[in-house]
């Protein structure tokens, strides 16, 4: 059986659309209708005509698609594909923080559970967080769950006071300054490109900081030939497609999000064939979470 052709056949029969994040395995990226970062994919999910969305990513992404389009069937091929950082933020903890800071606006990274989104004023991604914070009148901001993205945006918006949740991405947090300095010393003229989920000490020695889509755009438009890429290595698939003459180096030779790498072509095929692993969200909860995502699209540009 040619599983790729079978997937395309099932997709056509069912009128489905396949979305994939940049961190997915190359085979999934290649068969997807759209590949992108969280913000781009959330817009596609909201605006697409198809009534069946197969989201090759992690759970919070598929949940966001369902929140935005409750009338559509949203399928996550591997239900176990979660996000460690998203799990670090709890609704109970956020409710307590809101009581302690009643005048603060709550901005949650899209890498959050539906329950956290429901208690937040606005959602954001790494590509639109600065715009959103600047568009808020309030000076006090509760930002969760990523302390690294939060501190990065805090540097960009010094007129705001941030209360940061103590969460982080285990993949980006693991990178040490010494490894980046080693790579720099071994490759003269190399540019360092980092995701804002990296720690401040990594951001401070980087030449460019941006979301996955911003990293790809920066590298594609750069005349430089060598890059240290400090984000999940799935982005290398797109970078190599667009810059065959360029050299890319990943810290320690490996930056892997195991949850993002769970989804295989077989999983995608099985989910389309059986129409299983549908995302279901309580309507009252969905409506509360919807406001934060609606405000993201309104304020994020």
UniProtKB/Swiss-Prot annotation:
GO terms for biological process: 'de novo' NAD biosynthetic process from L-aspartate. Keywords: 4Fe-4S, Cytoplasm, Iron, Iron-sulfur, Metal-binding, Pyridine nucleotide biosynthesis, Transferase. One of its GO terms (molecular function) is 4 iron, 4 sulfur cluster binding. Its cofactor is [4Fe-4S] cluster. It catalyses: iminosuccinate + dihydroxyacetone phosphate = quinolinate + phosphate + 2 H2O + H(+). It is found in: Cytoplasm. Belongs to the quinolinate synthase family. Type 2 subfamily. This is Quinolinate synthase. It comes from Clostridium perfringens (strain ATCC 13124 / DSM 756 / JCM 1290 / NCIMB 6125 / NCTC 8237 / Type A). The gene is nadA.
